[in-house]
């Protein structure tokens, strides 16, 4: 079997359970050495239990792979740097960062508290920015010393809630939409040193989605996290050097490349608000409607 990530060093945040665990296991099975990061928090971000990360690392080692445990908070500036430093100190390099850690604090906008907003934005958005920043800073130094592309990889995790919008998730959706935009911009910034940046929008049944809908056995099998990890593993490999700035949906029977916002119908600018309204009314029936959670037109 071809081992796509032979000799590469990957950091996976939130790798104790769910999607992150599957990513870590598949990366290791494909030859990567893995820093298994997980606080072991509850779905709402409270608590901590490093045993979940330890179990993933133990499973990697028992299968013949290499892994170390990291219990840092990925959304902490110092914690994110510790992850990068641990990879470099353990194996002399870091090649891949998979930003996967996340929490949920769902609430309708009118009922959402400041803490519920802040905690979700912190974990998802800063938890993507901080590891990416420290990895990019490391790669820039490596690039300057070698003069060669570093072939680094950042793989972020967005969501259909951020891409299409889901009621009751203004905090989560805003964070995930921010991650999609972050991905596109970071890809443009880091291309010159040989780093690719992509995002996965997974459709999978994990503890974070467990209570959202009732599923039969067939539906549950289609939502197994294992269907997402092959895309992550390929993007982590050197073979994916030419793929960057993309948002890719994976799971529930499909792999799909998402198409982002683009300008539709347009008209010349006007000074009169009534005329502006008339032009808007004229254009709106001509443009594509917003997508629903299934990626199809909704409103």
Tell me the role of every PLM-derived stretch.
Residues 199, 218-299:
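C-terminal helical subdomain
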Residues 108-109, 116-121:
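Substrate-binding pocket helix/loop in short-chain dehydrogenase/reductase
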Residues 20, 132, 175:
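Active-site helix of classical SDR
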């Amino acid at each position: 079997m071809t081992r796509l990530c032979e000799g590469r060093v990957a950091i996976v945040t939130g790798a104790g359970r769910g999607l992150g665990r599957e990513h870590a296991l598949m990366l290791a099975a494909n030859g990567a050495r893995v820093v298994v990061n997980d606080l072991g928090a509850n779905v709402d971000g409270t608590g901590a239990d490093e045993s979940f990360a330890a179990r993933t690392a133990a499973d990697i080692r028992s299968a013949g792979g290499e892994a170390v445990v990291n219990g840092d908070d990925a959304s902490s500036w110092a914690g994110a740097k510790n992850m990068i430093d641990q990879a470099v100190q353990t194996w002399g390099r870091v090649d891949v960062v998979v930003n996967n850690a996340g929490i949920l604090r769902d609430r309708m906008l009118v009922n959402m508290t400041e803490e519920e907003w802040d905690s979700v934005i912190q974990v998802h958005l800063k938890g993507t920015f901080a590891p990416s920043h420290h990895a990019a800073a490391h790669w820039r130094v490596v690039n300057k010393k070698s003069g060669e592309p570093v072939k680094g990889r950042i793989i972020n995790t967005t969501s259909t809630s951020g891409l299409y919008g889901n009621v009751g998730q203004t905090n989560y959706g805003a964070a995930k939409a921010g991650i999609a935009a972050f991905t596109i911009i970071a890809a443009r910034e880091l291309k010159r040193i040989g780093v690719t940046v992509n995002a996965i929008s997974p459709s999978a049944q994990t503890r974070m989605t467990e209570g959202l809908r009732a599923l039969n056995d067939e539906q549950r099998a289609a939502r197994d996290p294992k269907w997402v990890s092959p895309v992550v593993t390929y993007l982590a490999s050197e073979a994916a050097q030419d793929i960057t700035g993309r948002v890719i949906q994976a799971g529930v029977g499909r792999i799909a490349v998402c198409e982002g916002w683009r300008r539709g119908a347009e008209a010349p600018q006007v000074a009169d608000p009534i005329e502006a309204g008339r032009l808007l009314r004229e254009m709106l029936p001509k443009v594509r409607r917003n997508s629903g959670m299934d990626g199809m037109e909704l409103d």
